[in-house]
């Protein structure tokens, strides 16, 4: 769009990058990286810095006729990107030719720096809620097995819920509703069985039978609701289910490998691909200078899923809180030091 503007001088084209660049800041994490877990591209889940956006922010602030709040916002963002490159010891973005072409960009003096610190934005079409507060940022996602991500100054953790019945393996939110101080995520899934054939099939090979011709018996429906409330020091997460009894559920907190877990009973440095059921109390999570606390934990069963299609946390460590439905549990994830 910037190139189209340069060719036509039609200012309407600049409204698109202005909106897009502002939106991008709502995807920046507290450590300055970009949240990519909902990406549909090859960068999904990777740690990506916004270096390639430097010249776009600088261009829009100096040549794009952006005025007022967005102009200052874009200048601060451009400066923050360069400062971050210097702090990390990385190369500056490859845009010298643009500075040579556009005098305003080359002569611009960058003073203030930083991205938007606090925001709350529901991207309803994408099923994404992004919230940044003083001590942490979090992302709630519809349609993903990892439905909640929390970032504390670069320390990323996420939540999943294991539900192993019929074709269901995980809680996947079908509805995401923003509330005054958080959000609600809800999903329903049927327990079902095949009815007997009304007409004898043409084969005795199960895999060759047209199962779509069989009726289903649906005796129960499991409804799972996750309610998230924000606090200054972290999140309050309530898990509530109804409609099915004695189903083993697993609330899973996935943390980076190398995180130290500790409480009054144990001290453990985590390894990738491993996990633990914590049956009671709170547990501290320490990674570098950052410390979080999680709990109260619970462990009513040891079933961790043994069916095909079960996801594994091969790159991190998993804390399991296990309960039998119906479930009505509340846990807290708190920032103790960031």
Which residues does each PLM region occupy?
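Inter-helical turn/loop segments and adjacent helix faces that build the functional surface
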Residues: 4-14
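Extended polysaccharide-engagement surfaces of secreted carbohydrate-active enzymes
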Residues: 12-288, 301
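Beta-strand-rich recognition/accessory modules
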Residues: 286-338
């Amino acid at each position: 769009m910037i190139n189209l503007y340069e060719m036509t001088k039609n200012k309407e084209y600049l409204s698109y990058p202005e909106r897009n660049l502002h939106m991008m800041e709502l995807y920046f994490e507290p450590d300055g990286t970009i949240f990519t877990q909902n990406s549909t591209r090859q960068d999904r889940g990777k740690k990506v810095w916004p270096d390639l956006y430097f010249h776009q922010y600088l261009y829009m602030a100096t040549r794009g006729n952006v005025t007022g709040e967005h102009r200052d916002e874009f200048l601060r963002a451009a400066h923050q990107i360069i400062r971050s490159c210097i702090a990390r010891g990385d190369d500056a973005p490859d845009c010298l030719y643009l500075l040579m072409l556009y005098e305003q960009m080359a002569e611009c003096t960058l003073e203030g720096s930083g991205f938007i610190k606090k925001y709350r934005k529901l991207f309803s079409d994408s099923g994404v809620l992004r919230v940044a507060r003083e001590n942490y940022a979090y992302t709630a996602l519809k349609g993903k097995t990892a439905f909640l991500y929390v970032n504390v100054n670069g320390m990323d953790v996420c939540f999943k819920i294991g539900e192993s019945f019929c074709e269901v393996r995980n809680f996947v939110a079908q509805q995401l509703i923003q509330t005054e101080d958080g959000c609600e995520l809800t999903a329903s899934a049927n327990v079902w069985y095949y009815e007997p054939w009304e007409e004898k099939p043409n084969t005795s090979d199960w895999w060759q039978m047209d199962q779509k011709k069989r009726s289903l018996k649906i005796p129960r429906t499991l409804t799972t609701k996750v309610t998230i409330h924000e606090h200054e020091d972290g999140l309050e997460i309530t898990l509530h289910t109804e409609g099915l009894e004695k189903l083993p559920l697993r609330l899973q907190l996935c943390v980076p490998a190398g995180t130290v877990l500790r409480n009054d009973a144990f001290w453990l440095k985590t390894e990738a691909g491993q996990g633990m059921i914590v049956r009671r109390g709170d547990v501290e999570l320490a990674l570098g200078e950052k410390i979080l606390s999680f709990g109260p934990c619970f462990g009513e069963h040891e079933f961790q899923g043994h069916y095909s299609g079960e996801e594994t946390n091969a790159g991190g460590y998993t804390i399991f809180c296990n309960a039998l439905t119906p479930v009505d549990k509340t846990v807290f994830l708190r920032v103790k030091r960031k």
